[in-house]
A protein has these predicted regions:
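Sec-dependent bacterial lipoprotein signal peptides
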Residues: 1-18
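Basic side chains
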Residues: 2, 38-40, 74
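Intrinsically disordered, low-complexity segments enriched in proline/serine/threonine
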Residues: 9, 90-91
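SH3-family beta-barrel domains
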Residues: 18-43, 51-55, 62-65, 69, ...
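A short beta-loop-beta micro-motif enriched in histidine and acidic residues
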Residues: 46
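SH3/SH3-like beta-barrel superfamily modules
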Residues: 53-89
Length: 95
């Protein structure tokens, strides 16, 4: 039971932290000056890329899910709210 409780608590803490920010503003950070963060059709690397987002792109978090040990957030672009997709939470910074 002890081995199960600690990873579960850690995962719930990560997800709760992101879900608590649903509707919160964030910016893309850490993609690098010559790279783009991929906005995907679903939460994982197997989903198609909708578009690339440079560092500094403003987004609104909608929700977050864990997929294969990676936290993914469903976001919309602040300047174009109709554009919605998933990005790795590792590349989002609170605004």
């Amino acid at each position: 039971m002890r081995h199960f409780a600690i990873p579960t608590l850690f995962t719930l803490t990560l997800v709760a932290g992101c879900v608590g920010e649903a509707g919160g503003k964030a910016v893309v950070a850490g993609a690098g000056p010559d790279d783009l963060l991929k906005l995907r059709a679903g939460p994982g690397l197997g989903y198609s890329v909708i578009m690339g987002l440079p560092d500094g792109t403003a987004v609104t978090r909608r929700s977050c899910v864990t997929e294969v040990g990676q936290l993914w957030c469903r976001v919309s672009l602040t300047t174009s709210p109709g554009i919605v997709g998933y990005v790795s939470a590792d590349y989002l910074s609170a605004r």
